[in-house]
Amino acid sequence: MRLILWLPVLVVVLLMVLEGPAPAQGAPDIAGTFRNIPNSLKEFGNNLKDAFESIPEATRKLMTSFAEGLKNFRIPMV
């Protein structure tokens, strides 16, 4: 009985092994990777520049809201 249950499993495993690697698992194209490095670095630099340019505005908004909160703060009288 066990042999009958294991035969389909064995067939599926053998088919998977004999099929070979999937295209996503194939060897990467090293030359293409090296060609894409400058574009990736430029995109990273642009993203970093945008992030740093938004820091002063975000800080200004945070400080303004904090100052408004302090203006409206009342100490309760007991």
UniProtKB/Swiss-Prot annotation:
<feature type="signal peptide">
    <location>
        <begin position="1"/>
        <end position="26"/>
    </location>
</feature>
<dbReference type="GO" id="GO:0032375">
    <property type="term" value="P:negative regulation of cholesterol transport"/>
</dbReference>
<protein>
    <recommendedName>
        <fullName>Apolipoprotein C-I</fullName>
    </recommendedName>
</protein>
<keyword id="KW-0732">Signal</keyword>
<dbReference type="InterPro" id="IPR006781">
    <property type="entry name" value="ApoC-I"/>
</dbReference>
<dbReference type="GO" id="GO:0042157">
    <property type="term" value="P:lipoprotein metabolic process"/>
</dbReference>
<dbReference type="GO" id="GO:0005504">
    <property type="term" value="F:fatty acid binding"/>
</dbReference>
<dbReference type="GO" id="GO:0050995">
    <property type="term" value="P:negative regulation of lipid catabolic process"/>
</dbReference>
<dbReference type="GO" id="GO:0034447">
    <property type="term" value="P:very-low-density lipoprotein particle clearance"/>
</dbReference>
<comment type="similarity">
    <text>Belongs to the apolipoprotein C1 family.</text>
</comment>
<keyword id="KW-0850">VLDL</keyword>
<dbReference type="GO" id="GO:0034361">
    <property type="term" value="C:very-low-density lipoprotein particle"/>
</dbReference>
<keyword id="KW-0813">Transport</keyword>
<keyword id="KW-0445">Lipid transport</keyword>
<dbReference type="GO" id="GO:0004859">
    <property type="term" value="F:phospholipase inhibitor activity"/>
</dbReference>
<dbReference type="GO" id="GO:0006869">
    <property type="term" value="P:lipid transport"/>
</dbReference>
<comment type="function">
    <text>Inhibitor of lipoprotein binding to the low density lipoprotein (LDL) receptor, LDL receptor-related protein, and very low density lipoprotein (VLDL) receptor. Associates with high density lipoproteins (HDL) and the triacylglycerol-rich lipoproteins in the plasma and makes up about 10% of the protein of the VLDL and 2% of that of HDL. Appears to interfere directly with fatty acid uptake and is also the major plasma inhibitor of cholesteryl ester transfer protein (CETP). Binds free fatty acids and reduces their intracellular esterification.</text>
</comment>
<keyword id="KW-0964">Secreted</keyword>
<dbReference type="GO" id="GO:0034364">
    <property type="term" value="C:high-density lipoprotein particle"/>
</dbReference>
<dbReference type="GO" id="GO:0006641">
    <property type="term" value="P:triglyceride metabolic process"/>
</dbReference>
<dbReference type="GO" id="GO:0010916">
    <property type="term" value="P:negative regulation of very-low-density lipoprotein particle clearance"/>
</dbReference>
